[in-house]
Amino acid sequence: MNIYDQLQAVEDRYEELGELLSDPEVVSDTKRFMELSREEANTRETVIAYREYKQVIQNISDAEEMIKEASGDADLEEMAKEELKKSKAAKEEYEERLKILLLPKDPNDDKNIILEIRGAAGGDEAALFAGDLLAMYQKYAETQGWRFEVMEASYNGVGGIKEVVAMVSGESVYSKLKYESGAHRVQRVPVTESQGRVHTSTATVLVMPEVEEMEYEIDPKDLRVDIYHASGAGGQNVNKVATAVRMVHIPTGIKVEMQEERTQQKNRDKALKIIRARVADHFAQIAQDEQDAERKSTVGTGDRSERIRTYNFPQNRVTDHRIGLTLQKLDTILAGKMDEVIDALVLYDQTQKLEELNK
């Protein structure tokens, strides 16, 4: 099937989806309605671009016809030639864009995410850097109009982050932040360093798509839930009523503890949301690891131990090792202006997939 047949098939399916979503039988089936709505949303941009492309093709045909019929009218002929030139340039641009739009879409791209950041190698300095990364993602989310909610956090004695779990909600969050999973390395002089020596520390980031209950069901028999008293600074119990929740997925051993909320039910709901995402992600990772290497993401969204980026403070430099991108803009990137890095990763991924498709 050539590209035009593919595009026509997408448009036909889009029109079919519009009819299905008006069908009372589909509307009453919440799960199917959501699936079809998501499919329609995922194809909308392609269909709009294809319809605009067909209009450009028509404009080329009209301009060529006008040139033939100009009959010595120099002004009309010049105008038609200008229109033809403009339309041919637009045709090339649309063809490149449509090739990218036809690439297989990640079904998770439109989803919200659960973001986990942990201080790793480097002790207090790693925890402080984890805090810097948290602030960077919070500021970036703000520029995108996303909602950023810290669900659970634990701190060390110097104000650094041992571990933080956050929910980021909004339009196409996963499509932008999915490349952030991996080890982030920092090179800088710690505040406690009297000799001015540069130290290297690491924090790890994990990005998981939010998983709705109807998408992934966990058997209640596979969960062990413990209720205990929430503790404050110094370990003292801060609630007379036990509201904190510890939830364990028995088959995998995945554990979540939640005590941020004032009620047991809210902590239970948040813990279940996180554990559902972690368990789904766990099995997705196993499936991905079993796939052929060529089918894995070319930008490395899979290997959680992969060192993906270095932040060098003395040189104000950020290097993304997966695509060889180096920017002398560390200060602006940590201030949440991440578009240049993220756009480069998206473009690289699309380019690699196009090359793979054309082999």
UniProtKB/Swiss-Prot annotation:
<dbReference type="InterPro" id="IPR005139">
    <property type="entry name" value="PCRF"/>
</dbReference>
<dbReference type="Pfam" id="PF00472">
    <property type="entry name" value="RF-1"/>
</dbReference>
<protein>
    <recommendedName>
        <fullName>Peptide chain release factor 1</fullName>
    </recommendedName>
</protein>
<dbReference type="InterPro" id="IPR004373">
    <property type="entry name" value="RF-1"/>
</dbReference>
<dbReference type="GO" id="GO:0016149">
    <property type="term" value="F:translation release factor activity, codon specific"/>
</dbReference>
<comment type="similarity">
    <text>Belongs to the prokaryotic/mitochondrial release factor family.</text>
</comment>
<keyword id="KW-0963">Cytoplasm</keyword>
<dbReference type="GO" id="GO:0005737">
    <property type="term" value="C:cytoplasm"/>
</dbReference>
<feature type="modified residue" description="N5-methylglutamine">
    <location>
        <position position="236"/>
    </location>
</feature>
<dbReference type="Pfam" id="PF03462">
    <property type="entry name" value="PCRF"/>
</dbReference>
<dbReference type="InterPro" id="IPR050057">
    <property type="entry name" value="Prokaryotic/Mito_RF"/>
</dbReference>
<comment type="function">
    <text>Peptide chain release factor 1 directs the termination of translation in response to the peptide chain termination codons UAG and UAA.</text>
</comment>
<dbReference type="InterPro" id="IPR045853">
    <property type="entry name" value="Pep_chain_release_fac_I_sf"/>
</dbReference>
<keyword id="KW-0648">Protein biosynthesis</keyword>
<dbReference type="InterPro" id="IPR000352">
    <property type="entry name" value="Pep_chain_release_fac_I"/>
</dbReference>
<keyword id="KW-0488">Methylation</keyword>
